Amino acid sequence: MARVLIVGAGAAGLMAAGAAVRQGHQVTVLEHTDKPGQKILVTGKGRCNVTNDCPAEEFLRHVRTNPRFLYSSLGAFPPAKTMELFEALGVELKVERGRRVFPVSDKAEEIRQALLRYAQDAEIVYDGAKKLLLEELPPELEAAPAVPENPRHPKKKKAGPALRCVGVRGTSGKEYRADAVLVATGGVSYPTTGSTGDGYRLAQQAGHTLVEPVPSLVSLVSHDPDCKKMMGLALKNVTLTLFEDGKDIFEEQGEMLFTHFGISGPLTLSASSHLGDMKKHTYCAEIRSEERRVGKECRSRWSPYH
């Protein structure tokens, strides 16, 4: 039995805690807010889109950046297993258009409670993670690389001794020691729910290099005043096409919403991950409907997004 310390009691942290407990480990979860799983409650308009009922291969096709990174994870735990897990935890699921999976209750709280039950044998400590506790790794324990080094692209030699993480110092000043430390803090997408970017700071402390984060799954802003006039207009079964410098780079059918600043909704969030550098490219969107009248009106009222 190993002592496992997990930083973050969101969906990932609770899933990891439950899995580690079932492997016989002693698990402690650090959470810097007073309520685990807060961000779950705002996903899917408060309904929580659990997963998509599709093969892992199709799932990966929709990952814009480095999908290979997720091969092993989705291979070991594909969407079907996610559905099986929640059904085993007592959550009745349904599959909607686009193969999106939601709880029948349409309540994200049911998913949060299921994850808390799954991780109930882990200890949740309400304390933040201020600093990783690092120790020098003895030379005899330094593992050989799993993959032979490519002579054409040799890796840079690290300066100084190899280090291993043996715990975390909490914001309270208390030290939490463990045989394994898992960082599951999420990103910086929703600070009010606890996603404040602590994981980036901890990763840097461990010597990792960070790729600059960019916005994704976000609403889009339009500078066309007519767009604001349609605020509150919700569209279903429309096709959204996104153009970059006149070339179509995304097209999908679904739901979207006009807001006081532009467009939002599931379709828009999916399209946003295809956007590049706004300073280097010009973007515009086209909205089409099976009903020609609606499609024509929406197209005439949309302007490029810069």
Give each language-model segment a name.
Residues 180-226:
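Glycine-rich loop(s) and the adjacent beta-strand/alpha-helix scaffold that form part
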Residues 3-29:
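N-terminal Rossmann-like FAD-binding beta1-loop-alpha1 element of flavoenzymes
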Residues 125-164:
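A conserved short coil-to-beta-strand element within the FAD-binding core of flavoproteins
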Residues 7, 176-189, 256-259:
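Short hydrophobic core segments
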Residues 171-173, 247:
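Glycine-centered tight beta-turn/hairpin loop motif at sheet-sheet or coil-to-beta transitions
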Residues 32-122:
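Conserved N-terminal/central alpha/beta ligand/cofactor-binding core
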Residues 28, 34-36, 42, 50, ...:
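An anion/pyrophosphate-binding glycine-rich loop and adjacent beta-alpha core
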Residues 92-115, 206, 210-231:
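Rossmann-like dinucleotide-binding cores of NAD(P)H-dependent redox enzymes
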